[in-house]
Curated annotation (Swiss-Prot):
Residues 618-660 form a coiled coil. One of its GO terms (cellular component) is chloroplast inner membrane. The gene is TIC214. Belongs to the TIC214 family. Part of the Tic complex. Keywords: Chloroplast, Coiled coil, Membrane, Plastid, Plastid inner membrane, Protein transport, Transmembrane, Transmembrane helix, Transport. Its main location: plastid. This is Protein TIC 214.
Length: 1703
């Protein structure tokens, strides 16, 4: 609401300012432009990109000065980008960065490496000087970051809008100043906001800010690198995309693969060797209209034109390239102005602009009139034409038009040097130049005999190189020729084959000549040349055997580089030759292989749904592992294993994620999408996350209170213990499993799989082959140093037992040798079986087992050890750790040092502490005696004791055990008792019986609850205290003696161990001394050898240098002597060259290269064979009918009628141009007559007089008698010269001149894409002006001139041309029947009936098929009608709607009846061709649906959540329980869920969805476009071939002719008078004027003059006006390059279109 109010206020402000325009004129210019400039300039600083992040980082780390420098660098980068709009080279360098694309990623790595560890100096002491190197680096970094923004990173929309407005309003000073002001204000606001943020961080941070800077720098370096990689992921570089192989091959030949094709990529020019311009980078996603459509994924022709009214030449017209947004804005503006009270007069606001444009237009019109009037004042058109200035070397040598910057202008481009073969490179000059050269050679022929001899030798050399047309071809080439004729199916070639076979049967010595090869069509001719030159290529590749890539060593490259490059050029040139001679057609036209269903392992060209590998079947994998664990396998077992491997199948499934690359062509980058998210199962529209927050429903205050109450109730229940029983037992396990699944889903995308898989493989190899071997070696070396036996065998055995098994991403095992398929995209896991753990020592188990241990317990321990051994595995992580499951928690590693520490503790306890126990024993005995003495004083209280000698075995060791286990419970009693028994057994040296052991157990059970000796003695019952006291004393004395002996033994053992350690230490010292002595000797010996080798090499190098110096001096002296000799030779050669003739001036008059190029384009048929075209169409439709197996009875109803196929206007045009006539071929007679046209093959009069003098005299007399009167009138003679033709489009027909000028490719390219302009050619025939020139009648002298007369008479008989009627000036409009000749009634009807006329004249073909097959071979003739050019009859019979057109009009006006007719047609089984045409005429709606209600949408959202939960669960067995529990908790409608499984798809769509389909505008009929394209090429060929025949006949005249004062009429273009740029400006000014004022040229043309026939220049004029019409995309000329890529079918066709042919 706030935004709407703001926009309303802004609109009112604009309207108020516009109302003040009459009062203040300057407000009219500022009112609309200034706010837009401020707004868009201010918004350029808001988008946050890498350059802004860099500036924020410098503010935080280095202070205000460095931050401002960084922002200045980014501003400089923005300013350079804005300047690129006005500077084209700068724009090309920034937008087409082939080199910068390769340098961006290394630069980013360099920047990241440089800033990851900042120095403390910059943090603690910010730099204050501007001349420091760090400031320059900072400025350069920010500048480069800003330049990279429009290249690789997605440029913000706001910045692009500013660029667009700057380009549009570049001439408006107010907009430029306001945008600059807004731009500066935005940056100032940005700087102040950063300073405010810095102030808050410094004052609010709990840590000292200087210490905090290091973490800030680390964070920003990571952030910048992440943003770069994210942007690169969204807009990837097209270097790594999949490339399609070029499948353009000839019709009947598969070209042999070139072995050097891959190795010769270095010889191709930059950047085609690294970039492929034909790759599909951003194709359009194909959406079929219906399920039953079988069209290809790439349409042949796509119409994206938007038709709207426009003003052209001061009148309304229909434009096909108008902007939809402009028309919508126009309607809204008109509605607003109509409803508003303020009346804005456009005439007043645009009055000044209109006046200036009108004055300019009038000036151009007046200049145009003056030039035309000058032509009518008996002047030639050459004098009236506007000239251009160009460069020249001297008076006679001019620059080529393409290379001249003055003449080519903006169309001048850099032309690469193409590689031609020798036969095409050495073409001769034009005929004018050859005539001049021949004259010069004739003059010099008699002067110098030496030059004459050189000329004859040169002539023989050319004869050997260029054979004549009647000479036979080689035998190998003849075999190729016959093979091509036998393989081809072209009817022209079949006729040619029959004629040649008949000639060969009559004459056995018949040979194929070059004349027969020139009669072949273009494709077959190219095949012949390619196959004949293929033998040369093979010989080139076979001859230099040393040129293979394996044998190309460094020495060969430098020594034989000339041969290599020469053979490489020869290998490349023939391939490029064929490509240049033939036009490449657009590729990928419905040739893509696709599958309607997403299937597994299908080779298609369209991307399908992503598939994920789950791995092979488990049962077969286990069998395979068991077989691999066997040590020895026989050959039969190996065969069985291989068979099982073949039988294994990989389980695959589709991924659950959405795939936006689906249904796109492979090798293409996915389309750019905005930042939209998909969060529902069925979502009709996407929304940006920024605007998605507006749709969030705010939580009310009452709902929050209820939530707090619920939480409080839960806490109370938890305190009371309610609900504890409802908690599941394995809650922790489920949560951990859910966590693992979420982590796996988070990393389940191709980029993460690629990086993670590579790291896992690296970690696996490092662990297996680097870390573990190093640990094993270090451990055993340590054991050797500690004088222990090494354990190499045990450690390497355990290391070999560790197996790394490669698994899929889900954890399914595949193999320990091979990686799973598509692991780089689908993920990888590595499972470690029997992981190796380094142990300090290995326990060697003996066979002696203690008898006291139970056998069952031993077996249990062994089985437990086996189970533990069998289940020992873990999963490897990218950091090298081990986990118990996939993405589980880390597994604890067993410590290496803990067993060593425990062993040291035990050893200390056993050896040191046990040996020092005699001290404790002594104090213990003292305490015992003292206590017994105290007890003896109380005899009355203690009963007597009767203790046997064998019962009281209480020893010091027993007391130690009690002290060792003072608080032992019942579980440890048995262990303690066992230790007591074992120690007593060792002490006495005898085995203890089971009875004594039981007694000890009973006694210990009685005394274990007492804490001291007092309690122990009070429980003993005996007879008397005295006996007990006596026995105690005896035992004490006996034990005291033993302890004394034991202490002496301890001392001796201790001394003995000390002596042993000293001996071992001395032995170690002796070994070290020996090693040092030997090492000293070895080092001394090595140093002496080293010094000797250095001395020897140094002396040898000195000797070599001396020898080289001596040799150089000798060579220098020899070179000086040879130089003098060469100077003398050069003087001799210069003198010889003065005597020779220049080879360029001594070329013959007619070379074979000219004949070759002339006949290459001289087709076998001089006219277009319409009969053959119609017959081919007829055959195609008949074949389609036969494939559908229609009955012959139904075919009889379909009748072929020529009126149904072609319109009257088309037939008239075809009859005028002679297209309905039969084709003609060159005969031997024609060749002989043609050869007489050239002076080289013409016999001189002297020789002819000497051979047949009488015949020659008779012929000369006849000619002189017939021309005596004419000779008396005019006695002026002229030599034979070429006629001057002043039309710029009437260029020389010699194709060798076009090849020399390198324009052949460009002109054919323009012809193919200029058919779009033809829809605007409303006036074609009546525009040419008539020029009265003097006609020069030819006075024939020679006999050969009869040929010209016969040809002239035959051409008059064949082409009956209608009389040309002059254009009247009574009406302002100019009528024409050729205008829009495919849609002739478009401009004569009203605007309301335009659509009906378009439909009424759409082509429908009704072909018939008779039962007899001979009827297909009949010729289809058209009844030609005369052209009705009278302006008083605007309508004719041809323009009246027939019955068929009425039906079509009724069909378009009644869509319901059309649907019925479609149903009836299906029932009646009409042909498929008619059905497809009817479907194209009636466009179908696009299927689109929406939910019926919001409740249904909520239910489906719940089902969506259910599916997302179920997709994570792996337990498929208990899936039903999960579904029921989720449905109960989430409130899902079970009936609706069941309907997905019970109902069909149509029933669900009726139940849940509503239809919201809408129709699109009608597509442009592709048949009209195809026909126009074909007609353009055919008309051009016809004009070209007729031009050849006329010029050949005119050049055959070798006599002198005389002129008479007689006027003839030739038609020229109006545009030829003025330059193309000025005439284009005139057209644009006429279209921009809003009033209906246009230039009427009718009164400039003489209406009284009529013409007897339509001559050849007028036919050329029709073709020229059809190919280059007068309306030449004026609306596109006014627009900028930002709009060029909108309204075209192939996205780049408009950019390739040349609006004007090169001048």
């Amino acid at each position: 609401m706030i935004g709407r109010l703001y926009m309303k206020k802004l609109k009112n402000l604009f309207l108020f300012l516009s109302s003040l325009c009459p009062v203040f004129p300057w407000i009219s210019q500022i009112s609309l432009v200034m706010p837009f400039g401020l707004y868009y300039g201010f918004l350029t600083a808001l988008p946050i990109g890498p350059s802004q992040i860099l500036s924020i980082r410098t503010f935080f780390l280095e202070g205000n000065r460095s931050g401002i420098i960084c922002i200045l660098g980014s501003m400089m980068g923005q300013f350079v980008i804005l300047l690129s709009i006005y500077c084209s080279p700068l724009y090309v360098m920034l937008v087409k960065p082939h080199l910068m694309t390769l340098l961006v990623i290394p630069y980013m790595f360099y920047y990241w490496y440089r800033t990851k560890n900042p120095s403390r100096y910059y943090i603690l002491h910010p730099i204050k000087s501007l001349t420091h190197a760090h400031t320059r680096n900072l400025l350069l970094d920010s500048f480069i970051f800003q330049l990279l923004n429009p290249i690789l990173l997605p440029n913000p929309v706001l910045t692009r809008l500013l660029n667009l407005f700057l380009f549009r309003y570049s001439s408006n000073v107010f907009f430029l100043t306001s945008s600059l002001l807004g731009w500066l204000c935005g940056h100032i606001l940005f700087i102040n906001s950063i300073k405010l943020l810095l102030f808050r961080i410094e004052h609010d941070s709990p840590i000292i800010y200087i210490l905090m800077k290091r973490s800030i720098s680390r964070t920003f370096s990571i952030l910048i690198s992440i943003t770069f990689f994210l942007y690169l992921g969204r807009s990837p570089v097209p270097l790594i995309t999949k490339k399609f192989a070029d499948e353009i091959t000839l019709s009947d030949q598969k070209i042999k693969e070139n072995l050097w094709e891959e190795s010769l990529w270095l010889y191709r020019p930059w950047p085609t060797s690294f970039f492929d311009q034909y790759r599909w980078n951003r194709p359009i996603r194909y959406i079929p209209n219906s399920k039953s459509s079988h069209n290809g994924f790439v349409k042949k022709q796509v119409s994206k034109f938007f038709y709207d009214e426009c003003i052209t030449d001061g009148k309304n017209a229909i434009s096909f390239a108008s902007q939809p947004s402009l028309s919508i804005f126009k309607k809204q503006l008109m509605n607003y102005l109509h409803n508003s009270d303020i009346s804005i007069s456009t005439k007043d606001s645009y009055k000044g602009w209109i006046e200036t444009k009108r004055e300019k237009r009038d000036a151009l019109n007046n200049e145009f009139k003056d030039r035309i009037q000058f032509v009518y004042n008996s002047s030639t058109i050459e004098e009236a034409m506007e000239n251009k200035t160009g460069f020249s070397h001297d008076r006679n040598h001019f620059l080529v038009k393409v290379n001249d910057p003055f003449l080519s202008g903006s169309s001048r481009i850099r032309i690469p040097n193409k590689k031609y073969s020798s036969s095409l490179l050495k073409l001769h000059d034009s005929k004018d130049q050859t005539m001049k050269i021949s004259k010069k050679t004739k003059r010099k022929h008699t002067r110098n005999k030496m030059r004459n001899w050189i000329f004859n030798k040169h002539k023989k050399w050319q004869h050997n190189k260029f054979p004549l047309p009647w000479e036979p071809i080689p035998t190998k080439a003849e075999k190729v020729f016959w093979r091509i004729l036998n393989e081809s199916e072209n009817p022209i070639i079949l006729e040619m084959l029959t004629t040649l076979n008949s000639i060969k049967e009559k004459n056995y010595q018949f040979r194929i000549t070059w004349e027969h090869i020139f009669q072949l069509p273009r494709i077959e001719k190219a095949i012949f040349l390619f196959r004949s030159k293929q033998e040369i290529e093979d010989s080139i590749f076979r001859y230099p055997s040393h040129l293979s890539l394996k044998n190309l060593t460094l020495f060969n490259i430098f020594t034989r580089s000339k041969n290599i490059f020469y053979s490489a050029k020869i290998a490349v040139s023939p391939i490029l030759q064929i490509e240049e001679m033939q036009k490449e057609l657009p590729r990928y036209n419905s040739r893509l292989r696709s599958d309607r269903i997403d299937a597994v392992n299908v080779d298609v060209d369209i991307r399908q749904r992503k598939i994920k590998n789950l791995g092979p079947r488990k049962g077969k994998l286990e069998d395979k592992e068991k077989e691999k664990e066997k040590a020895a396998q026989t050959q039969t077992e190996v065969k069985k294993e291989r068979e099982k491997e073949k039988e294994e199948r990989v389980i695959k499934r589709f991924q659950n994620q959405s795939d936006f690359r689906r249904k796109l062509v492979k090798g293409s980058i996915r389309a750019r999408r905005r930042k939209t998210g998909i969060w529902r199962l069925y979502q009709s529209g996407t929304h940006s996350p920024f605007f998605l927050r507006m749709k969030e429903i705010p939580i009310s205050f009452q709902s929050s209170i209820n939530a707090l109450r619920l939480n409080k109730m839960k806490d109370e229940r938890a305190i009371l213990g309610i609900g504890k029983e409802l908690r599941p037992f394995n809650l922790y396990k489920k949560r951990s499993k859910a966590d693992r699944l979420t982590i796996a889903a988070r990393f389940d995308f191709p980029i993460a799989h690629a990086g993670r898989g590579v790291l896992l493989i690296i970690q696996s190899n490092i662990r297996k082959y680097v870390i573990l071997p190093i640990l094993i070696i270090c451990k055993n070396i340590g054991r050797i140093m500690l004088f222990q036996s090494p354990e190499w065998k045990e450690d390497w055995a355990e290391w070999n037992q560790e197996i790394h098994i490669k698994c899929t991403y889900d954890g399914i095992e595949v193999s320990h040798r091979h990686l799973p398929a598509h692991w780089f995209k689908e993920g990888l896991q590595i499972k470690i079986l029997y992981p190796f753990h380094l142990k300090p020592w290995h326990i060697h188990r003996t066979n002696n087992i203690n008898d006291l241990r139970n056998e069952a317990q031993i077996q249990k321990e062994i089985s437990d050890f086996g189970k533990q051994r069998k289940l020992s595995f873990s999963y490897l992580t990218i950091w090298g750790y081990q986990t118990s499951s996939v993405f589980g928690s880390m597994k604890k590693r067993p410590s290496f040092w803990r067993p060593i520490a425990n062993a040291l503790k035990k050893k200390l306890q056993r050896n040191l502490f046990s040996k020092l126990t005699w001290i404790s024993h002594f104090f213990y005995e003292i305490i015992l005696l003292s206590r017994t003495f105290i007890i003896s004083k109380k005899p009355n209280n203690i009963p007597e004791m009767s203790i046997q000698s064998n019962e009281l075995r209480y020893d010091v060791s027993d007391y130690e055990l009690i002290q060792k286990y003072p608080n032992s419970n019942e579980k440890n009693d048995y262990v303690v008792m066992n230790e007591i028994s074992i120690e007593s057994n060792n002490r006495n040296g005898k085995e203890i019986s089971h009875e004594s052991q039981d007694q000890y157990k009973d006694n210990f059970n009685n005394i274990r609850s007492f804490n001291d000796i007092e309690t122990l003695l009070t429980d003993i019952s005996g007879t008397s205290v005295e006996e007990s006291y006596r026995d105690r004393i005896e035992t004490y004395l006996r034990l005291n003696k033993k302890n004394h002996r034991y202490a002496i033994n301890i001392r001796l053992i201790w001394n003995k161990q000390l002596v042993q350690t000293q001996q071992e230490f001395s032995r170690f010292r002796r070994i070290i001394m020996q090693f040092m002595h030997k090492g000293y000797r070895l080092a001394k010996r090595f140093l002496t050898k080293f010094y000797r080798e250095i001395f020897r090499r140094f002396t040898f190098s000195i000797q070599l240098s001396i020898q080289l110096v001596l040799r150089l001096t000798k060579n220098i002296t020899k070179l000086s002597e040879k130089n003098k000799v060469y100077q003398n030779l050069n003087l001799l050669k210069k003198n010889e060259q003065n005597l020779k003739i220049d080879s360029s001036r001594n070329k013959p008059v007619l070379s074979q290269a000219y004949v070759f190029q002339k006949l290459w384009h001289a087709r076998t048929r001089t006219k277009i064979d319409v009969h053959y075209l119609v017959q081919s169409l007829e055959r195609e439709i008949v074949n389609s009918i036969e494939n559908n197996e229609l009955k012959a009875s139904k075919l009889k109803d379909l009748k072929w009628n020529e009126h149904n196929y072609l319109n009257d206007h088309i037939k008239d045009l075809l009859e005028i141009q002679g297209l309905l006539k039969e084709t003609q071929t060159f005969t031997e007679k024609n060749w002989k007559e043609w050869l007489h046209c050239f002076t080289r093959y013409q016999i001189s009069s002297k020789i002819e007089y000497g051979i047949v003098p009488q015949k020659w005299k008779n012929e000369v007399k006849k000619r002189w008698k017939s021309n005596t009167n004419k000779l008396d009138k005019n006695k002026e003679y002229k030599t034979l010269e070429k006629e001057n033709k002043y039309s710029l489009y009437e260029t020389n027909n010699m194709l060798k001149q076009r090849i020399n000028n390198r324009n052949n490719y460009c002109e054919f390219y323009n012809l193919l894409y200029s058919f779009i302009d033809s829809t605007k050619a409303s006036n074609i025939i009546k525009l040419p002006i008539q020029q009265k020139g003097k006609e020069d009648p030819i006075q024939y002298i020679n006999d050969i001139n009869k040929i010209h007369e016969n040809i002239h008479l035959n051409s008059k008989k064949k082409y009956k041309r209608p009389q040309f009627q002059s254009i009247s000036t009574e009406k302002g409009d100019i009528d024409s029947n050729l205008m829009l000749w495919l849609l002739p009634n478009l401009l004569d009807t009203k605007p309301e009936s335009v659509t009906n006329s378009l439909d009424s004249y759409s082509f429908e073909m009704y072909l018939s098929q008779n039962e007899d097959k001979d009827s297909l071979k009949k010729e289809i003739r058209f009844n030609a009608k005369k052209l009705n050019l009278d302006t008083k009859e605007p309508t004719s019979d041809a323009m009246k709607p027939t019955s068929d057109t009425k039906e079509l009009i009724s069909d378009t006006n009644e869509p319901t009846s059309d649907i019925k007719s479609d149903d009836q047609s299906e029932n009646q089984n009409k042909p498929l061709k008619e059905k497809s045409i009817r479907e194209r005429k009636h466009h179908r709606p696009i299927p689109q649906v929406k939910w019926k209600s919001k409740s249904v949408e909520k239910k489906m959202q719940r089902i969506n959540n259910l599916t997302s939960f179920l997709s994570v669960i792996e337990d498929r067995k208990n899936m039903e329980n999960y579904i029921i529990s989720f449905c109960m908790k989430m409130g899902i409608d079970i009936d609706l869920l069941n309907s997905f499984f019970t109902n069909t798809e149509d029933e669900l769509s009726i139940q849940l969805l509503d239809d919201s389909a809408h129709r699109l505008p009608r597509l442009l009929n592709d048949q009209t476009l195809v026909r126009k394209m074909v007609s353009i090429l055919l008309n051009f060929e016809k004009q070209f071939e007729e031009g050849i025949t006329s010029k050949i006949s005119s050049q055959s005249i070798s006599s002198i002719y005389r002129t008479e004062k007689k006027y003839s009429v030739n038609s020229y273009n109006l545009e030829d008078i003025m330059l193309s740029r000025r005439y284009r400006e005139l057209r644009i000014l006429n279209s921009l004027i809003l009033e209906k004022q246009y230039v009427n040229f009718d009164h400039w043309i003489d209406k009284s003059e009529k013409y007897p026939f339509l001559n050849l220049p007028s036919q050329v004029q029709i073709i020229k006006r059809f190919l280059w019409p007068t309306y030449r995309l004026e609306d596109l000329a006014c627009m900028n390059r930002f709009w060029f890529n909108t309204n075209n079918g192939s996205r780049f066709a408009m950019l390739k279109l040349r609006m004007y042919c090169p001048d």
